[in-house]
Amino acid sequence: MNLSNLKPAEGSTKTRKRIGRGAGSGLGGTSTRGHKGAKSRSGYSKKVGFEGGQMPLQRRVPKFGFKNINRVEYKAINLDTIQTLADAKNLTKVGISDFIEAGFISSNQLVKVLGNGALTNKLEVEANAFSKSAAAAIEAAGGTVVKL
């Protein structure tokens, strides 16, 4: 045995299917594609959402709603969260930078303070928006509301 007469092991390789090479090959004629129809044609690719001519689901279901391009999204932060943050870091002024540092928001998010919980400290709170109950609770505790 040498490099010039090496052969693959018996049964380890298959001869590839040569289609469309005449009737004598056994794979001529329709070339394993069956008769007619889109799948037998060259360049065929199934379109996304195509259901064989049936009205596709996307067109059967009615349209509804829209995305309001003027919508302003706020990240909600409650008073009890602000209180725990102020206690942990011994703060008298709580602002956007403190929320970012604590990981409550990312740098491009807007903050709305909501009135869930209670404040015990006198705090100056900076945010983009406040609910009426939150603003009242902050001022009742002797603090100030700074709307950015």
From Swiss-Prot:
Domain of life: Bacteria
Regions of compositional bias (Gly residues) in chain numbering: 21-31
Residues forming coiled coils: none
GO cellular component: cytosolic large ribosomal subunit
Keyword terms of this UniProt record: Ribonucleoprotein, Ribosomal protein, RNA-binding, rRNA-binding
Region (Disordered), start-end ranges: 1-51
Disulfide bonds: none
Gene Ontology molecular function: any one: rRNA binding
Keyword Aminoacyl-tRNA synthetase: no
Gene Ontology terms describing biological process: translation
Metal-binding in keyword set: no
A family per Pfam: Ribosomal_L27A
Family annotation (Gene3D superfamilies): 3.100.10.10
Assembly with partners or alone: Part of the 50S ribosomal subunit.
The family this protein is said to belong to: Belongs to the universal ribosomal protein uL15 family.
PANTHER family the UniProt entry points to: 50S RIBOSOMAL PROTEIN L15 (PTHR12934), LARGE RIBOSOMAL SUBUNIT PROTEIN UL15M (PTHR12934:SF11)
Function: Binds to the 23S rRNA.
Name of the protein in question: Large ribosomal subunit protein uL15
Organism (species): Bacteroides thetaiotaomicron (strain ATCC 29148 / DSM 2079 / JCM 5827 / CCUG 10774 / NCTC 10582 / VPI-5482 / E50)
Gene name of this polypeptide: rplO
